[in-house]
Amino acid sequence: TLAAVYGMYARAYLEMGYWKEGGDADAFSKAASYARQAITVSGKTPLTEAQWTDPATGFNSGSSNNSWIWGLPVSNDLIGNIICFTAHLSCEGTWGYTTLSNPGINKALYDKIAPGDFRHKSFLSPDRSKWTDGTYKFAGNATAQAAFLKSLAKPYTAIKFRPVGGETNTYTVGNPADHMLMRVEEMYFIEMEAVAQSDLGQAKTLLNDFMALRVLDGSYDCSGVQDLSRFITEMLVQKRIEFWGEGIMFFDYKRLDRGITRSYEGSNHPSMWAFNVSGRSPQWNFVINRGEFQANAGISEATNNPDPSGLLVVPE
């Protein structure tokens, strides 16, 4: 669609805005313009709380909401029980890798979600009493829900990505989730980051307006943020919460030279992955393997990305 094209332009110009020392005002202006055009032309609107938390269609069905600008439909003849997106990220399904990996949110990020922000409901609270007090909507029937909470659920477990139709036991029904490639919400964040480069006050207004759709009691307010650096940090926190598990933040963190913080007091990361990186992580630069550049005269080891092996130190 034209809106998806505008969205791709917005993504590209936002990246290009940082290519020049001190920023490229023209690229940032175009990023904001294309992001706004994508919003307008698409006619799309941010997800509501009901759509976000729906145990049958949450983040698995493009036709169930008015948020997705671009996505891929998936049918059950294209997937197996474990080789698909749902099997890796939908914790309520009983057939996938999630029964072992139990993906969840970083505790430090969870603690930054405002109390009135309904995105809290994508992740199980460390207070287990909230699991059964009506705070959450779970997929499956009562028996399936009880089994999930008893054996698979842990504090901070993600329930953002639901098995299709809320089916937790039959993978041919629960696995074929539509693949989301671009939500209109991303355009709002691109616009505010680009606008912030020249008009911080307007960018704060844009973030406040967006967050009023997430913190429904109206209590969110970033007006006190004093400079561009602090605004970008706050904006990234909200963007991380918004797009957790969707693959959007990878490029933001590379572009803005942000690091990884997993080793800290009270961290919920497994020890083998609990490392900290100041600035972009070396593992984010993909390395072409030796067999490929030995067989392909068009590339060489000299032009390859550096091998990141051994550059990440895991604390004892």
Question: Language-model segments: what does each one mean?
Answer:
Residues 1-86, 99, 103, 110-316:
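Acidic/polar-rich alpha-helix caps and helix-coil junctions
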Residues 89-90:
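A low-complexity, Ser/Thr/Gly/Pro-enriched, surface-exposed linker/loop concept
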